[in-house]
Amino acid sequence: MQFPESWLRSFVNPPIATAELSHRLTMAGLEVEEVDPVAPPFSQIVVGHVVEVNKHPDADRLNVCKVDAGTGELLQIVCGAPNVSVGIKVPCALVGAELPPGDDGKPFKIKIGKLRGVESYGMLCSARELKLSEEHGGLLILPEDTPVGADIRKVLDLDDQIFIIKLTPNKADCLSIHGVAREVSALTGAPITLPTMAPVAVTLSDKLPVKVEAPDLCGRFAGRIIRGVNARAKTPAWMVSRIERAGMRSVSALVDISNYVMLELGRPSHVFDLDKIHGGLTVRWGKPGEQLKLLNGDTVTVDDKVGVISDEQAIESLAGIMGGDKTAVTLDTQNIYVEAAFWWPAAIQGRARRYNFSTDAGHRFERGVDYATIVEHIERISALILDICGGQAGPIDDQIVNCPKREPVRMRVARAARVLGIPLSHEVVSDVFKRLGLTFSVDGDVFVVEPPSYRFDIEIEEDLIEEVARIYGFEQIPAKPPVAENAMRPTNEARRTMHDVRHAVAARDYHEVVNFAFVETEWEADFAGNTQPIPLLNPIASQYSVMRSTLIGGLLDKVRYNLNRKASRVRLFEVGRVFRRDAEVADGGLSVAGYAQPMRVGGIAYGPAAEEQWGVPARAVDFFDVKGDVESLLWPLQARFERAEHSALHPGRAARVVLDGRAVGWIGELHPRWLQKYELPTAPVVWELDLDAITAVGLPAYREVPRVPAVTRDIALVVRQDVGVQDLVDAFEKAAAGMPWQRYLQGVVLFDEFRPKAATAAIGAQEKSLAFRITLQDTDSTLQDDLVEAATQQLIRAAGDAFGARLRA
């Protein structure tokens, strides 16, 4: 927003300098980006009255003028401007004057000179020569009542400053001189003076029929007829100056008045040519296919999401954005209809951008404009029109349809003090609210504030706390380093955190990655067997169109990324959410009805099992390497690995991970068909686990340090080739349950497997030999041989009963 300081000071004039005013506005949240002078420095330029104009005797394009510059004698000045004439008043640079610097950056000093033999004692100036504008078609002609000899800087108020303020979207109440003046008054305590908005004399009874059909578009609509205006009337110089210094251009008196009041009071309005309106006006949503030629010359096609104002024949305006060309006022307009309304912000937001333009009116309405002062502002517009353009005014037709109902906002003083980090008393808060003009009551420690009709940014407690901070002064809040006053909490030894899991995986030589939760539809089908993934309504890219239900796709993609960059060994892991449909999930603080969002941890290993080292034979990572990583991650939990099939994994080299009878994840080699599809030279091994299932590890159980060595027995069992090792281990655990020696059993571990190429006397063609090491230990005394033997035999019998196992001869 841009405005001249003099205009602001006509509303509120605190006894502070420009720099201090700029600083206070900035510290209150109205960031002053620039403060620029209206005109560059120059001196000895006064108002001159051209008394006589004669042709130059030796130049067709030059004139010899006699000018009264208030010096007591007429000055002879040679001038080449085409618009010089007797009787005009123009800026006159006296001998010794310094004009603004030119392109070379040096000031231009006026001296007595000769032009084609005629002496010139000064210079008549254009606006461009004074750096007031780019207009260079002739001299800058001043009003007739301008005093001769007066300093041009004072006459044109050229010592004024232009403020350029960068407003945040919530400060729509400051998109006017009145709004900024309210802030200055609150910050400095200076009284505010408003322009008169007394009702004008109503001399007509005419009303234009208006029907509001869309209360969700327009909450209040008001307007009046004014007849007999002179649209060719000249806009007063003071108004033109203020409009131009606010960054707008002067168009015509009627348009200038509408723009002036918008800048002054923040009230966008529209002036229709009454004689071009057919019948009455209707405020409604557009109909698909309707077209409108706008004031900017563009023709737009509307639909039922765009608000319009129409007459009986066609639409005449885009509601709250821009008027139509058909009913625009011209210099021949005699009768007008002045309209002002409250448009709901949600009904205006984004509409102008659909047509690739923006307007000052739309910028204000989409943020919220005061709905309570519409009539007063129409009176202000009417008074200016009658004063400048003449005419007769009819009554204001004010229709209140659906204005916002503002709920009181409560602010706890104690909470405000805690948020701001400063002590706050009731007196301080009360003073701030009074300076802001907020109506409030006090209920104990709580201030109950009625939000003003022009403050759409006050809705919750934090908004009021912000107001207290702004007016109290951010610079008065002491700068202190943040102090985290954390109470010591006991560590839950029965659970480990997500960070513990991440550190544990990283310790196994995996590197963490963070992938998008948005994946390709194809990945879901390939790696999760999910043919109905959760789609995204507005994906950031076509390949990220669905939510992932597995981490495998992203991990595999990053392996390919690294392989394309000549990496030979890649070990990655990720901890993140996956998404799946679940009708049992209800809405909650962090949940969405119908969708489960569990946390998973997954990893992938590709290439050599270990980094290249001269003393270690090179070999590719396999299922059992990664199984060891998973077992290490799960420790002290003991998991079962059950053979199973998964759409992403090799059918013979995949296992389901089971904890306490519950499936918590998968591990396996990537399926051969995906190796070819995704162009991988060799198969990586992948794994994925439910994070919640592996964080509960239970309390550690402490045991006495053994005083005697452990006893081991090795047994080799011959079983059918389809018998799984895990099944045998389960049989051993079942046999040990309840036995006297169970407490001594430390473990049964497979240490060898043998499959003969051909049948032998000891092992058949469809059999294999599995060698287990049984470890027993008592912490106090050496175990007796008979107990060890009994335990060993019982385990052998259990394997024989369950799977027909026999000792290998």
Curated annotation (Swiss-Prot):
Query: Catalyses which reaction?
Result: tRNA(Phe) + L-phenylalanine + ATP = L-phenylalanyl-tRNA(Phe) + AMP + diphosphate + H(+)
Instruction: Tell me where in this chain the B5 domain is found.
Output: 404-479
Domain tRNA-binding: from-to ranges: 39-153
Q: Which Pfam families match?
A: B3_4, B5, FDX-ACB, tRNA_bind, tRNA_synthFbeta
Q: Kindly report the protein's main subcellular placement as a broad class.
A: cytoplasm
| Sequence ranges assigned to domain FDX-ACB in this UniProt record | 706-808
Q: Which GO terms describe its biological process?
A: phenylalanyl-tRNA aminoacylation
User: What are the required cofactors?
Assistant: Mg(2+)
Q: Which domain of life is it from?
A: Bacteria
Q: Where does Mg(2+) bind?
A: 457, 463, 466-467
Cofactor binding mode, per the note?
Binds 2 magnesium ions per tetramer.
Q: Where are the transmembrane segments?
A: none
Protein's cellular compartments:
Cytoplasm
Its quaternary organisation is: Tetramer of two alpha and two beta subunits.
**Family annotation (HAMAP family):** Phe_tRNA_synth_beta1
Q: What is this protein called?
A: Phenylalanine--tRNA ligase beta subunit
Its source organism is: Ralstonia nicotianae (strain ATCC BAA-1114 / GMI1000)
